[in-house]
Amino acid sequence: MKERSTELVQGFRHSVPYINAHRGKTFVVMLGGEAIEHENFSSIVNDIGLLHSLGIRLVVVYGARPQIDSNLADHNYEPIYHKHTRVTDARTLEMVKQAAGLLQLDITARLSMSLNNTPLQGAHINVVSGNFIIAQPLGVDDGVDYCHSGRIRRIDEEAIHRQLDNGAIVLLGPVAVSVTGESFNLTSEEVATQLAIKLKAEKMIGFCSSQGVTDSEGNIISELFPNDAQKRIEDLEQDGDYNSGTVRFLRGAVKACRSGVRRSHLLSYQEDGALIQELFSRDGIGTQIVMESAEQVRRATINDIGGILELIRPLEQQGILVRRSREQLEMEIDKFTIIERDNLTIACAALYPFPDEHIGEMACVAVHPDYRSSSRGEMLLNRITNQARQMGLKKLFVLTTRSIHWFQERGFTPAEVDVLPIQKQELYNYQRRSKILLADL
């Protein structure tokens, strides 16, 4: 008998909201030359084809830095840099054109066959390249002529949108022409960033050798705000890292984020399926640069009752929380604060004030099992504490059977029933024997 697994079913159920959310949106995907050289590149291209089949509008930008350096080395020609930017003289430009041209043909071919050996075999992917970008020279800096190194002068976003409307993937590289007919070498991060901004893309996606940005202990930082990302760039540059995939993408992501691109994602090109895991799961797998966190701490509304019930029911069944009916929750919803992530309630807590006695109760504290190892409980405690202070309360108490040490570590001390408000003393359940913990505000 064939073995059955529900993993596929669960994965599909979790991904469907993201499939619907992403359909019709514009994503700019930046592929550095290092990613293209890696053995996992075929899988990345296949996943890009899969995104296209789901109705996502895709602009793919490729770089060629290592390929250009390899061409120069083959001709015993030393690359020239000024302020960490390549100086593209006439000879170097020929190597740039050669590398970029070969990559364009190779990526086009791979995208064209990316849906082979899948249920979508036979579906045609139209890949379009062209002179959508007009370049201009960088010019002369400190007496150094950058020659054919350039920057973007303008982008024909209307023409690109027409191609996307027609169902094509737009593929653009590091070479663009000027109004005078000259060719210029651009950086892939500038191309990707400016395209994301001009096209009002929903996302910009880049790849690096690691799984994203990590902290000092090697843990992935799932979310960075632009100022934090800028600080990380400065730290890396101080260590001499000016041109790694991480630094180049972060520079572009900070600019894109501040210019209206909602999220920029940095992923590993070495991990198979990283693109799919990042885009179709709640927590992703890499690092996002965002202006606004995917999580929100806010007061609950009547529309949140279903999510709160789903969160607290398992804890009620285990006897950890006192059971609340939907009707009770509806009447008390204004007491609740929740943490929401991508429309899922992942944590909640309630504040019941007793203003005559200048004391409040923090109750119904619950955190989704997938997020208990993080600081969500601390976030709720801080928010409830601030609310209590704003109400003029002097003390905060909790009744708990399981989280005694957690609250004690945060300034709560054991207390007796007589410290509770009179109303609460009358309702105290001596059979449940909850521990009473009290904190001064």
Curated annotation (Swiss-Prot):
Main localisation: cytoplasm
Keywords of this entry: Acyltransferase, Amino-acid biosynthesis, Arginine biosynthesis, Cytoplasm, Transferase
CDD domains for the chain: AAK_NAGS-ABP (cd04237), NAT_SF (cd04301)
Biochemical pathway: Amino-acid biosynthesis; L-arginine biosynthesis; N(2)-acetyl-L-ornithine from L-glutamate: step 1/4
Any one annotated GO CC term: cytoplasm
Subcellular location field: Cytoplasm
EC number: 2.3.1.1
Molecular function terms from GO: L-glutamate N-acetyltransferase activity
Lineage top rank: taxon: Bacteria
Keyword Zinc found: no
Record-annotated N-acetyltransferase domain positions: 295-434
Catalytic activity as recorded in UniProt: L-glutamate + acetyl-CoA = N-acetyl-L-glutamate + CoA + H(+)
Top enzyme class: transferase
Gene3D superfamilies, sorted: 3.40.630.30, Acetylglutamate kinase-like (3.40.1160.10)
A GO BP annotation: L-arginine biosynthetic process
Segment forming the signal sequence: none
InterPro entries on file: AceGlu_kinase-like_sf, Acyl_CoA_acyltransferase, Asp/Glu/Uridylate_kinase, GNAT_dom, NAGS_kin, NH2A_AcTrfase
Pfam families with a match to the protein in the record: AA_kinase, Acetyltransf_1
Statement: the UniProt record of this protein carries the keyword Cytoplasm: yes
SUBUNIT field: Homohexamer.
Family stated for the protein in its record: Belongs to the acetyltransferase family. ArgA subfamily.
The protein, known as: Amino-acid acetyltransferase
Originating gene: argA
